[in-house]
């Protein structure tokens, strides 16, 4: 099991500097993580640092609130891909889900999936804000719109990934769709717990410490 290939090595805080992106990319090269996950403004720079490697640049769309319109999310997706993004993690319209406006939730996801084309799309449902019924519905809609993954959390809300949520998401989408656990995954033990629950990708800012088997003290 190549644990590094499960990990999106992440730096999404608003105060992230160019130097921190350079460090993130260097660590990703050294440890051969699946991707670095950075905000859209950092995609082009991260891509330039990872030329000639297998490490993808992942970015986030409508992040962290998910409250942009479908058209804005689609534009953001296309712009990020033009800059070199190889994967996109979008946040759903959480309020629309709460309102049971499932057509809008679906339209929003489809806008990004269509804009992304062959680029992997992950759909962040922000589990901490949802009931179990809403989590299931969000996963069903994401799957129906052709997304590649469902993802637990932004890491910027009231809670992160739990093994219970990952297991529920896996049960909902079946064996073939990706499930990404993110938010509060800080140790080797955390990662293994999430993988055992059904996760096929991990979002973490503590990727190096995880691989070293260390408990990290980061925020997300």
Swiss-Prot record:
Name the SMART domains on file. Answer: DeoC
Q: Which GO terms describe its molecular function?
A: deoxyribose-phosphate aldolase activity
- One Pfam family here: DeoC
Q: Which residues form the active site?
A: 89 (proton donor/acceptor), 151 (schiff-base intermediate with acetaldehyde), 180 (proton donor/acceptor)
Matching entries from SUPFAM superfamilies are given as: Aldolase
- The signal peptide annotation in the UniProt record is none
Pathway assignment = Carbohydrate degradation; 2-deoxy-D-ribose 1-phosphate degradation; D-glyceraldehyde 3-phosphate and acetaldehyde from 2-deoxy-alpha-D-ribose 1-phosphate: step 2/2
Q: Which reactions appear under catalytic activity for this entry?
A: 2-deoxy-D-ribose 5-phosphate = D-glyceraldehyde 3-phosphate + acetaldehyde
Q: Where does it reside? A: Cytoplasm
Q: What is its EC number?
A: 4.1.2.4
Q: Which UniProt keywords apply?
A: Cytoplasm, Lyase, Schiff base
Cellular component per GO, a single term: cytoplasm
Does NAD count among this protein's keywords? no
* Biological-process GO terms, alphabetical: 2-deoxyribose 1-phosphate catabolic process; carbohydrate catabolic process; deoxyribonucleotide catabolic process
Please state which protein family the record places this protein in. Belongs to the DeoC/FbaB aldolase family. DeoC type 1 subfamily.
Record's function text: Catalyzes a reversible aldol reaction between acetaldehyde and D-glyceraldehyde 3-phosphate to generate 2-deoxy-D-ribose 5-phosphate.
Q: What is this protein called?
A: Deoxyribose-phosphate aldolase
